[in-house]
Amino acid sequence: MSSAAGFCASRPGLLFLGLLLLPLVVAFASAEAEEDGDLQCLCVKTTSQVRPRHITSLEVIKAGPHCPTAQLIATLKNGRKICLDLQAPLYKKIIKKLLES
């Protein structure tokens, strides 16, 4: 028997306590990650095929440690959120007008 197995066998209460605390530690780590924000790009796929009249709001997420490129997320009238292509001429024009106002 290995020393770790022998230790666990001789301390079942400690093993039980460790198993009880494990979900708490995982939950705490997950909550901390959510607090810091997701460290990944939200927009994996973008589109330039959305008409402006279908958009109710726009959200721009700047490039940073979470993602190397800026992201433009549109909320549509049906509630769906999609990522728009920042390089599309139409969206560049919209962003320019938003920044000017």
From Swiss-Prot:
Any one GO molecular-function label of the UniProt entry: CXCR chemokine receptor binding
Signal peptide: 1-31
Pfam family, any one: IL8
S-S bridge residues: 41-67, 43-83
BP-aspect Gene Ontology terms: adenylate cyclase-activating G protein-coupled receptor signaling pathway; antimicrobial humoral immune response mediated by antimicrobial peptide; cellular response to lipopolysaccharide; cytokine-mediated signaling pathway; defense response to protozoan; inflammatory response; killing by host of symbiont cells; leukocyte chemotaxis
Classification via PROSITE patterns: SMALL_CYTOKINES_CXC (PS00471)
InterPro entries: Chemokine_b/g/d, Chemokine_CXC, Chemokine_CXC_CS, Chemokine_IL8-like_dom, CXC_Chemokine_domain, Interleukin_8-like_sf
Subcellular compartments: Secreted
Binding site residues for heparin: 92-98
Residues bearing PTM Phosphoserine: 57
Induction section of the entry: By inflammatory conditions.
CDD domains, per the entry: Chemokine_CXC (cd00273)
GO CC annotation, single: extracellular space
Keyword terms: Chemotaxis, Cytokine, Disulfide bond, Heparin-binding, Phosphoprotein, Secreted, Signal
UniProt keyword Glycoprotein, yes or no: no
Family: Belongs to the intercrine alpha (chemokine CxC) family.
Subunit architecture: Homotetramer. Interacts with TNFAIP6 (via Link domain). Interacts with CCR1. Interacts with CXCR3. Interacts with THBD; this interaction enhances generation of activated protein C.
Record function comment: Chemokine released during platelet aggregation that plays a role in different biological processes including hematopoiesis, cell proliferation, differentiation, and activation. Acts via different functional receptors including CCR1, CXCR3A or CXCR3B. Upon interaction with CXCR3A receptor, induces activated T-lymphocytes migration mediated via downstream Ras/extracellular signal-regulated kinase (ERK) signaling. Neutralizes the anticoagulant effect of heparin by binding more strongly to heparin than to the chondroitin-4-sulfate chains of the carrier molecule.
Name of the protein: Platelet factor 4
Organism of provenance: Homo sapiens (Human)
